[in-house]
Amino acid sequence: MEGDCLSCMKYLMFVFNFFIFLGGACLLGIGIWVMVDPTGFREIVAANPLLITGAYILLAMGGLLFLLGFLGCCGAVRENKCLLLFFFLFILIIFLAELSAAILAFIFRGNLTREFFTKELTKHYQGSNDTDVFSATWNSVMITFGCCGVNGPEDFKYASVFRLLTLDSDEVPEACCRREPQSRDGVLLSREECLLGRDLFLNKQGCYTVILNAFETYVYLAGALAIGVLAIELFAMIFAMCLFRGIIQ
């Protein structure tokens, strides 16, 4: 009976570690996606280190869980006491680190305010300057989503650097201009009328809602995965210790 129980724990340990392996791969994938996001949202909040820190934590935790899941599977199948003990201690450290990352993600979500984005835009935006990463990223977002500013075109009335560079000749940047719906090259309806602030030729929608939804998509996804991985890790630690004690006896 004791042998059957030990064998059952061994295979349960293997199953849990296989799920940890998959969870680590998912977290690793999300972390990579955040870092190489083609729409460039990362650069918009580059002044806030929480997003970058969170992405690196996802990468680190995903990579560790990926390797640790493989290690746990080997320890369970081979019934190696050293591997099991190392697995237990290591996964305990990761468990505590992930709790810290969850708190960090919660704090970061609170910083995604309309006021924060508006402040960053009015302070740093430089118009069509492609050499400035912040401005180029904002231009990419506004063109991609057909929006203008954080709240709307009126944001650029208070963008000090933009107003200085354009000598107040343009009401809005070119990225705010509406484009021909059927045009693959993004031909503007009327650049001149748009830059003069004519409503018919510029996008009136602010980008805040679009950006917030995009961030919340992978924040919630990462949070759901983290909760699932934490639960699996907890059971894996229990099975690892039970299997370790069973091997000793």
Curated annotation (Swiss-Prot):
Stated name of the protein: Tetraspanin-18
Source organism, top-level taxon: Eukaryota
Main localisation: membrane
The UniProt record lists the keyword Plastid: no
Residues exposed to the Cytoplasmic side: 1-13, 71-83, 245-249
Organism (species): Bos taurus
Role, per record: Plays a role in the cell surface localization of ORAI1 and may participate in the regulation of Ca(2+) signaling and the VWF release in response to inflammatory stimuli.
Family note: Belongs to the tetraspanin (TM4SF) family.
One Pfam family this sequence matches: Tetraspanin
Topological relation to the membrane, as annotated: Multi-pass membrane protein
